Amino acid sequence: MKKVRLPFRLFCFLLCLTRCTSVMPGYIPVTPGNPDRNSLIECYFNLGLDYSEIINFLLLVHGIRLSVRQLKRVLFSKDLCRRKNHSDIEEVIAAVERELDGSGSLIGYRQMHQRLRVDYGLVVSRETVRHALKLLDPDGVERRSQHKLKRRAYSAKGPNFIWHLDGYDKLKPFGLCIHGAIDGYSRRILWLEVGPSNNNPRIVARYFMDCVKELGGAPRTIRGDRGTENVNIAAMQSFLRRNGTDSMAGQKSFLYGRSVSNQRIEAWWSFLRNNDTDWWINFFKDLRDVGLYCDDNPLHVECLRFCFIPLLQKELNRVAQHWNLHKMRPSLNQESPPGRPDVLYFLPELNGVNSYLKSVDDDDELLVAEELCCENHVMQADETFVELAQMIMNDNNLQIPRTPVEASNLYSEVLYHIESMI
């Protein structure tokens, strides 16, 4: 194998793993229709929604009318209860310890309780989780107790009134670029993707278009910075809103501004850093400090991406899902309503507001997507390099990593075998 072709082929292989699709994974069944009622109830219950939220989702999204008494009967028949039949304390401790080995070391007991409930299916009280964290991670509890964050006033009239999007570059020294979008009113994360670039306008445009197709419309306005990555989204948004009759139709529907003033998404990046990516930054710095990773070595960068992007994407999906399902407490800003982002976004009627989603017809979507978005096949890898990577993993019995440690081991193994071919 020629030395000059290896970095290029590695890059192609990486792109195969970094798919250019981006709507939040379908953890919540919001598609209208008439699926099995009891299955819907079980799904919403396991996501942590309370009785009134479950009933409202069933009625307003699925057209299923149910009383609290009927709901309780269904839950009883399925043996679903949050205050009885608590999980074994050893299972709880084991799950907490597993989370503390990763980014869970950054979160408090409320988020830890949510992870145990949603990801592990454990029935446990918040108080038990609080005591477990105090016992297993006293230093972390003390550090988090000193943290305070002051936010500026903000106003949005309803879901899809304004979306905020931005790139997150804290992991860029390691070849990992994150891009995300958040709804201004509900604070629901609309997409959160990691890949080799968040500056390619065609890739970022695909994130936006996938979200528009999933929701069936575009927002009233979008706010982003003047980076080159936003030029396609700005053109798409203006085109999709070209026939609007409101004051923000057409080109006015994309608002440019400095990244630091894009308040909603910038505040959420702070949350992401404190609750997830800070752990990953330190993890990758450790690889660099011991000489396993060199950020000016293209081979190291591509190998790190190959081994860690799928794992990190899974983690980001989990962080976004948990955020969208968590309950936000009342704040001094009356324009930021309390509640769960998912409930605020999908059921705005409960708070007396309307969704500002602007319907988009399929012809418009397809036309814009074809012109300004990357195609799925563009992000696929070179077949010969896929065969090379599979050969290395198969010949050496290397498994797809499930944890950061396993990904680190795979990184070392793949790097060793590829360098031996040069």
Where are these regions (language model features)?
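Positively charged n-region of N-terminal signal peptides that target proteins for export
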Residues: 2-3
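A short, amphipathic alpha-helix used for macromolecular contacts
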Residues: 30-59, 85-128, 165-171
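Major-groove recognition helix of helix-turn-helix-like DNA-binding domains
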Residues: 40, 64-81, 125-137
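RNase H-like DDE/DDD metal-dependent nuclease/strand-transfer catalytic core used by mobile genetic elements
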Residues: 59, 121-143, 148-333, 381, ...
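Short Lys/Arg-enriched helix C-cap and helix-to-coil transition segments
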Residues: 81-97, 141-153
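Short amphipathic alpha-helical segments embedded in low-complexity Lys/Glu-rich regions
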Residues: 115, 146-150, 338-341
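Protein C-terminal end segments and domain termini
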Residues: 328-422
